[in-house]
Structures are given as C-alpha cells and as structure tokens.
Amino acid sequence: MAPSKRKASAPPQTSHVNGNPSADKKRKTTTDAPPTNPNTSSDPLRAPHPFYKDSETHGIVLRKFYPHEMSNARAQAYNDNELPRPIETLSAALAETAALRKSLPVRQAVVHWFKMDLRLHDNRSLWLASQKAKEAGVPLICLYVLSPEDLEAHLRAPIRVDFMLRTLEVLKTDLEDLGIPLWVETVEKRKEVPTKIKELMKSWGASHLFCAMEYEVDELRREAKLVKLLAEGEKGEKMAADVVHDTCVVMPGALQSGSGGQYAVYSPWFRAWIKHIEENPECLEIYEKPGPNPPGTKEKHENLFACSIPEAPEGKRLRDDEKARYHSLWPAGEHEALKRLEKFCDEAIGKYAERRNIPAMQGTSNLSVHFASGTLSARTAIRTARDRNNTKKLNGGNEGIQRWISEVAWRDFYKHVLVHWPYVCMNKPFKPTYSNIEWSYNVDHFHAWTQGRTGFPIIDAAMRQVLSTGYMHNRLRMIVASFLAKDLLVDWRMGERYFMEHLIDGDFASNNGGWGFAASVGVDPQPYFRVFNPLLQSEKFDPDGDYIRKWVEELRDLPELKGGKGGEIHDPYGRGSEKVKKKLEEKGYPRPIVEHSGARDRALDAYKRGLARDL
C-alpha cells in the first residue's frame, strides 16, 4: 500500500458541533463542581441524583476527583443547551486566540505534546508541529506528561500503563533517530498540568504548542485552560496552542441529521459518515512522519535527550510474572501496530464477517490496544482496509472488509457521543431517566462475576481470560455485560469501571458505549426487554466448547459434542450426569448463582419500575 501523502497546508479552524459557542446568551454559567453539602445549594441544577450515595459507596463516582452524581435535570440541561458543553468551552478559547496563533512569531522551538497519539506515522498534530518548526528553522521538541492522578481518576489499568510506557521507549528511539528529543514530565497534581507545560515551554524558549484533541470532559476543559494560559502575558511572553482534530476520521459534530441535530443512532450516522468521506476524500489522506531536526539540536538540547522513561506510578505497576506474560502477548509501539494491521488485512479481513463473533477463532484484528493508545490511527486502518477492497469502496465489495470498517467506525461514533452528550462522561446514562433504576449492589454476585465463578461457563471463561491476558473478545464483552446488568441486576457502572481497570485496550468512549448498549441505558441501545440468554449465546458462538475449555480448567474433561446444542459443557449442572456433577463439585466449579428465567423477569420489573419514576 502506498497511500497519498498530505502536502503542507494551514490547519483549519476548529469548528464547534453547534456553531458559534457564544451564540446562546441564555446559557447558565454554573460549573459541575457542587457545594460541599449537596443539599444546601440554591441552584437546583447542583442537586445530586437521589441515588447518589449508592454510586459513591460502591466506587462508581470517585469523590476525590469528581462531584456527586448529577441530577437528571442537570443532564437534561446539557440536552436543552442550557449548560455549555466542554467542546464549546474549548472552541471558544481557540476562537479567542486564533489571531494570536496566526501572527505569533516562532521563537526558539516548537513543541508537540503526545497524549493518546503515540506514533510518528499519520499523526496530524505532530506533522503540523514539524512543519511549523521546519518553516522557522528551529527544533521540534516532543513532550509527554505523566499524571499519576489522571491515571487514577481515569481508572487506567496497570497493563495499559505498562503498554504506554513501553510504547514511549519505542517512540523515544524513533524520535532520536530524527534528532528529535522526547521529554517525559511527571506532574503529581493533575490540575497543575497546564501550568507545568507553560513552564517547560518557557524554559525551552518555545512559542508554539501542538496537540491532538481528546474528547472526554476532563481533557476538553484542561485544554481550554491551557489555550488561554499560554496566551497570557506580555508581548514577548505569549505562546500559542493549537489543539487539533485527529483522533477520529470524521470530526465529531461534523455529521448532522436532516433536521440539523446530532445523530443518536449508529446506522444513519454511519451512512452519513460514509457519504462524508466519499465527498471529502482528504479524510483518508495520510500524514507523513516528521523530518529530522536541524543539525546541532542534540548538542543544544543534550539534557532533553538524556531524559529517561519513568516507571509506572504506585498502584499502576505489574508484577514481574505479569510483565513477562503481557510483554509476550502485547508487543508495544507503532511498528507492531502496522505489522499487525498488514497481517490482518493479508490473511483474515476477507473472512472477518463470518468469523468475527467466534472467540475460539483468530477472526478479529486484535488492534484495539493500538487504537486506544494511538499507536495506530483509525485513518490508516480504514485507508488500508479500503485499499484492499477490489471496489476501493468503504461500503461495497468484500463483505469482510465492509464489516470491519463499520466496526472501526463505532469508535468514531462513540467519541461523537461524548462531545454532544458530555454527561455520559460523568457517570450518567445517555438517557438520564435510566438513572432511576434501583440496581443491586450484591458484593458476592459482583465478586463471582469478576473472578469467573458464576456457574455459567461462557461467562466464566470470558472473565478468566481478562484476568490472564487483559483482553476479551467483543462478543463476549456484550454477553458478560448483559449478564451483570440484567441477570444479576448489578449496577452496570461497576462493570464499566472493572473493564477500565483491567483491559489493555480500555478506551472510555468505546467502553462506555458498549456498556450502555448491553445494559440498555446508552445511545442506540438494545431495548431493555431484550436480555441475552447466556446458554443460547454459548451454544451459538462457542458451539464445540473450545473457548470454554481453554479458559475454564474444571470443564476441560467434559466430552466434546460437535454442533453445540445439548453439550454438557454449556450447562454442566443442568445437563451433566450425577457423576459429572459430583466431579465438578470436587473440582470446586460453582453451580449457577442465578436462574436465568427468573433473573430476566426480575430485571424487566426493575427496568419498568425505574422508568416509571420521576426523579
């Protein structure tokens, strides 16, 4: 594949999903920070949801960093345009500083701030920074900020932190080959990140900063603060920050329905996404990696090149045995990402449509870790897949290629959701009224689910795979999420958190979107009365029990029954002989902790009662 390269051009102005962010003069200026006592505020939008104590008691809302769970009225205020969305706050800051960015002379250096874009290939922000430095004849300096508080607040899994640090080692080597330093700065207090970046830029004599936009609430607000902070000061002290769209193939908010609103359903959004790319082929043009720094950069910035990659912060470290296992399973860096992409497109993408739901087969790309860490851009992935299609189209030709592209596009869709419905980042379901469901907080049930000891073989196999590898097949994510939320009626947000704390590919938008779908509380959900039957799912997607045997040691000796239906391995206590049951009990394999039919009825009743409440 030899994708076309982008030529130098001026970065487009950042647009906002709703047009002019300052146009609505009626908007309230209240923030999301509540008073110490949530029941004493005169602002009704600051009152917490009536069930807020449950979310705090069970670790869903981290009060160390965030306010109480907001009321449904506050979530609705975002929908009614009464509260500014964080994207609007950042867009306003960029608009206010646009003239400065255009006119400010380059001083001694240009900085690129790496975040979740840990690659040289097809990195728009890095390319723009490189072009700026090249035009001015000054060095490009790269920066990564390690914030232990952010890792804690965002529930970053130790396995993912380890992958990120290993990727930084690869990135540092690749940059050094170009004479570009990578400075890694640890900032203990997350709120001090903008100030520390400004201090570093001042010490380097840098005038311009480039970084990719992240769409979660914390990051949008942080970058809005940074943009304004860098623009402050006397004439010779001002700095410019360009926060550019790059994470998604199509910028969130760019696609609007016929009525001018934002899409809340994937299918029409995806059709609009396809149409937009076809009409704007530059969406899939690939950015070149940066050129080398000017001669003498290494001598001038010797201290920056001497920077080492730190170890993981306390609480985010792996044991030595985990490191050995995970490093073998998950090689880090963009070279591995591109190699895996090419291998998948060469060997498996053509059969993706028919194999993608079978966890015992190598039918998927296993690229989610690279999308999450930014070692591979969605643009490169989709461009590569499209170019392998005999039609050279996104939605025509090989069915496997079409299906895979549509699955990668879900990633864009869920980030689009974060931008327009920001309260989903704040422990609220997409449909606020679903907050009124009374969930169970049965600790024994939740623990059995996390440890793969529910007595439902397909559930237990999937959860044990996570504990062993930090990864789970997407079909299984849907099955285990539905089981937790509906069979056990445990608050889906506890499962959402558990996934983020254990998955190597934990991405907030995709994880939140997936849980919203499975628990029927999110955007484009399955109706709440549709409840996955774990037995039927097991028979359909692991018919011979190969996946279950791999991960549930207690069931490996059960006889194989090709074709799945009736096989003991799917329901050993319900279908096994007395001898089989006795052997399972001796091995310690648990009986089912709930009866599916009764659990389904309980879930439907809880959903009906919750949705009938007006809280």
Curated annotation (Swiss-Prot):
GO function term, MF aspect, one: deoxyribodipyrimidine photo-lyase activity
Record's catalysed reaction(s): cyclobutadipyrimidine (in DNA) = 2 pyrimidine residues (in DNA)
Annotated site location: Electron transfer via tryptophanyl radical: 439, 492, 515
Residues annotated as domain Photolyase/cryptochrome alpha/beta: 108-249
Keywords from the UniProt entry: Chromophore, DNA damage, DNA repair, DNA-binding, FAD, Flavoprotein, Lyase, Nucleotide-binding
Cofactor dependence: FAD; (6R)-5,10-methylene-5,6,7,8-tetrahydrofolate
Chain residues that bind FAD: 352, 364-368, 505-507
E.C. numbers: 4.1.99.3
Any Pfam family hit: FAD_binding_7
Recorded superkingdom: Eukaryota
Binding, DNA: 356, 537
Compositional bias segments (type: Polar residues): 11-21
Region (Interaction with DNA): 407-414, 474-475
Low complexity bias spans: 31-40
Family annotation (InterPro entries): Crypto/Photolyase_FAD-like_sf, Crypto/Photolyase_N_sf, Cryptochr/Photolyase_FAD-bd, Cryptochrome/DNA_photolyase_1, DNA_photolyase_1_CS_C, DNA_photolyase_N, Rossmann-like_a/b/a_fold
Enzyme class: lyase
GO biological process: circadian regulation of gene expression; DNA repair; entrainment of circadian clock by photoperiod
Cofactor detail note: Binds 1 FAD per subunit. Binds 1 5,10-methenyltetrahydrofolate (MTHF) non-covalently per subunit.
Region (Disordered): 1-53
GO CC term (a single one): nucleus
Similarity-based family: Belongs to the DNA photolyase class-1 family.
Task of the protein: Involved in repair of UV radiation-induced DNA damage. Catalyzes the light-dependent monomerization (300-600 nm) of cyclobutyl pyrimidine dimers (in cis-syn configuration), which are formed between adjacent bases on the same DNA strand upon exposure to ultraviolet radiation.
Subunit structure: Monomer.
Record-given protein name: Deoxyribodipyrimidine photo-lyase
